[in-house]
């Protein structure tokens, strides 16, 4: 499978959790220092393996071991690109 936005990947999960590798962060995410800091704290950075879940208008994403779970609105999640694992 190829690279897709976090929003598209999460939508395909039908509410179940899914595993993906973060490939890149789009420019709209890169220019927001506060958002970048949140992503860094959660370990949601390129090459990180994350667990993703879709939830009404937002995407929940977490990296094991960080203890941080991010709820990203779709308008932000669509600028985080992932490749499905497994």
List each model region and its residues:
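Mid-protein regulatory/catalytic core that forms ligand/cofactor-binding pockets
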Residues: 1-75
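Short, charged, intrinsically disordered terminal tails
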Residues: 76-86
